[in-house]
């Protein structure tokens, strides 16, 4: 059991902790001087510290003792030793959970000192009007004992320091429940994990705000995005989806990548109505394949994990396919394979340069061997496109690109470009470690490592990517239709 020493002075008109504060507090604002030490506290009973809660129009007449960062250490103390102006020592014990309060050694004298103060003419002459903020409903009953009052002071003290409003409680029937009970700490000062802990457990986070506040938060979720690396918040339409604080590359949807690469008003999608028919009738008890497809379609607004079409890149006609990791992890099924195959065949017939932006977890297991056959199908039409027609194909690898996509068209580009810090591999780190029982070196599957080993041609940031692609196309004799349209 931890113990703390407090020097108290009992006099006729006031009770104070020895020490100093830079200023008196009549609000919830923290004191500018928040450092604390043993024997350095003030408890001026003439100061008013207003409580909170639905029925808390009272003032508890206590000053701010410590800042909120010291709250855990303060709560963990179960026993306090005090001494009066005559140097008589007392031991005060209170159990927050049971609201048990005990004072050893000359209990009656100590109670008398408290009772004398609360019965003083200063307190009795206070206004008891409903609009008087200094009116204390606990004091109106002269029989109110010091034990209950100290309990209420301690309870209100902790509430005010943590700055929690009354609506944070999960329901109205808990309004009379002691807040301290919900902020239980261990003797070492570390927070215990408790099922009914209303402040810090994620499971009960929805209880921390009213339904109205929750709806407002949901509405603004469309405006903000959180960085995966530094966890900073930024406007969702941040330029190029690159964190402004740490430079981390955030995931982009296929539609965002199309908007980034293709000139406005020139995008013509292909095969938008092609959807999977669940060819092998793959079903799980938890969630059938068709249900997963429907859910992904509602979430992303896409029919499958790739968008294909034609457009202009700085005035140069191109065929473009962009995979979307948000749709079932960008997995490659029969629809993805068919759409990419048709795109390549169209580019071959029209002699268009080809760009495929890869972001995938690999072949889709729900379609079995049919998904694996897409690797061979796409590779075969690419062979005709590159070898027979001598056309130009650029592969852009984003994070993550793994599995069957890496083993097929992802690594078949005439020029292979990767985004900075992209995760590119055939088998994932966890699979390798579980299979070979060996640790995978950190960063060995990052784009920078692959570039050093010659598996990539370039790592290009998002900002200059469009210009780099335009120069590569012009180098291979693909010129803009109208030079005036070049940005």
Swiss-Prot record:
Protein's cellular compartments: Plastid, Chloroplast stroma
Predominant subcellular localization, coarse grouping: plastid
Stretches assigned to the CoA carboxyltransferase N-terminal domain: 223-487
Domain of life of the organism encoding this protein: Eukaryota
Cofactor binding annotation: Binds 1 zinc ion per subunit.
InterPro entries for this protein: AcCoA_carboxyl_beta (IPR034733), Acetyl_CoA_COase_Trfase_b_su (IPR000438), ClpP/crotonase-like_dom_sf (IPR029045), COA_CT_N (IPR011762)
One of the Pfam families matching this protein, by short name: Carboxyl_trans
Keywords in alphabetical order: ATP-binding, Chloroplast, Fatty acid biosynthesis, Fatty acid metabolism, Lipid biosynthesis, Lipid metabolism, Metal-binding, Nucleotide-binding, Plastid, Transferase, Zinc, Zinc-finger
Any Gene Ontology biological process: fatty acid biosynthetic process
Ligand binding (Zn(2+)): 227, 230, 243, 246
PROSITE patterns: COA_CT_NTER
Pathway: Lipid metabolism; malonyl-CoA biosynthesis; malonyl-CoA from acetyl-CoA: step 1/1
Zinc fingers classed as C4-type: ranges: 227-246
Record flagged with keyword Plastid: yes
Cofactor dependency: Zn(2+)
Entry's EC annotation: 2.1.3.15
Transmembrane regions listed in the UniProt entry: none
Enzymatic reactions: N(6)-carboxybiotinyl-L-lysyl-[protein] + acetyl-CoA = N(6)-biotinyl-L-lysyl-[protein] + malonyl-CoA
One annotated Gene Ontology cellular component of this protein: chloroplast stroma
NCBIfam families the record matches: accD (TIGR00515)
Role, per record: Component of the acetyl coenzyme A carboxylase (ACC) complex. Biotin carboxylase (BC) catalyzes the carboxylation of biotin on its carrier protein (BCCP) and then the CO(2) group is transferred by the transcarboxylase to acetyl-CoA to form malonyl-CoA.
Family membership: Belongs to the AccD/PCCB family.
The protein's assembly and partners: Acetyl-CoA carboxylase is a heterohexamer composed of biotin carboxyl carrier protein, biotin carboxylase and 2 subunits each of ACCase subunit alpha and ACCase plastid-coded subunit beta (accD).
PANTHER family: ACETYL-COENZYME A CARBOXYLASE CARBOXYL TRANSFERASE SUBUNIT BETA, CHLOROPLASTIC (PTHR42995:SF5)
UniProt-recorded name of the protein: Acetyl-coenzyme A carboxylase carboxyl transferase subunit beta, chloroplastic
Organism, scientific name: Nasturtium officinale (Watercress)
């Amino acid at each position: 059991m931890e113990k703390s020493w407090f020097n108290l002075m009992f006099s006729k008109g006031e009770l104070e902790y020895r020490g100093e504060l830079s200023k008196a507090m009549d609000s919830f604002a923290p004191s500018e001087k928040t450092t604390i030490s043993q024997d350095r506290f003030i408890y001026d009973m003439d100061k008013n510290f207003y409580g909170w809660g639905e029925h808390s129009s009272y003032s508890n007449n206590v000053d701010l003792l410590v800042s909120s960062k010291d709250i855990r250490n303060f709560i963990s103390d179960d026993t306090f030793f005090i001494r009066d102006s005559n140097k008589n020592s007392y031991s005060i014990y209170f159990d927050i959970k049971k609201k048990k309060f005990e004072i050893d050694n000359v209990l009656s004298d100590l109670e008398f000192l408290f009772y004398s103060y609360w019965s003083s003419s200063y307190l009795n002459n206070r206004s008891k009007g409903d609009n008087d903020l200094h009116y204390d409903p606990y004091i109106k009953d002269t029989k109110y004992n010091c034990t209950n009052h100290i309990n209420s002071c301690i309870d209100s003290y902790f509430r005010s320091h943590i700055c929690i409003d009354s609506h944070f409680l999960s329901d109205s029937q808990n309004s009379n429940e002691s807040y301290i009970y919900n902020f239980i700490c261990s003797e070492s000062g570390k927070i215990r994990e408790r099922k009914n802990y209303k402040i810090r457990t994620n499971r009960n986070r929805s209880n921390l705000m009213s339904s109205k506040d929750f709806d407002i938060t949901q509405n603004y979720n469309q405006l903000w995005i959180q960085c995966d690396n530094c966890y900073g918040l930024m406007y969702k339409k941040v330029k190029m989806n690159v964190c402004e604080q740490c430079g981390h590359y955030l995931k982009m949807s296929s539609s965002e990548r199309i908007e980034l690469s293709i000139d406005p008003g020139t995008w013509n999608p292909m095969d938008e109505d092609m959807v999977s028919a669940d060819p092998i009738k793959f079903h799980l008890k938890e969630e059938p394949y068709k249900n997963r497809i429907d859910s992904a379609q509602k979430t992303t607004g896409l029919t499958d994990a790739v968008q294909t079409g034609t457009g202009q890149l700085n005035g140069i006609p191109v065929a473009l396919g962009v995979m979307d990791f948000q749709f079932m992890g960008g997995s490659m099924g029969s629809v993805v394979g068919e759409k990419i195959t048709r795109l390549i065949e169209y580019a071959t017939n029209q002699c268009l340069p080809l760009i495929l932006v890869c972001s995938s977890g690999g072949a889709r297991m729900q379609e079995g061997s049919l998904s694996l056959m897409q690797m061979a199908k796409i590779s075969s039409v690419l062979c005709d496109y590159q070898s027979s027609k001598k056309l130009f194909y650029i592969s852009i690898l984003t994070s993550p690109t793994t599995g069957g996509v890496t083993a097929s068209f992802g690594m078949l580009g005439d020029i292979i470009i990767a985004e900075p810090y992209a995760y590119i591999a055939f088998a994932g780190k966890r699979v390798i470690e579980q299979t070979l029982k060996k640790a995978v070196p950190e960063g060995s599957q990052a784009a920078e490592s692959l570039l050093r080993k010659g598996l990539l041609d370039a790592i290009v940031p998002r900002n200059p990517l469009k210009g780099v692609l335009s120069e590569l196309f012009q180098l291979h004799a693909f010129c803009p239709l109208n030079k005036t349209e070049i940005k």
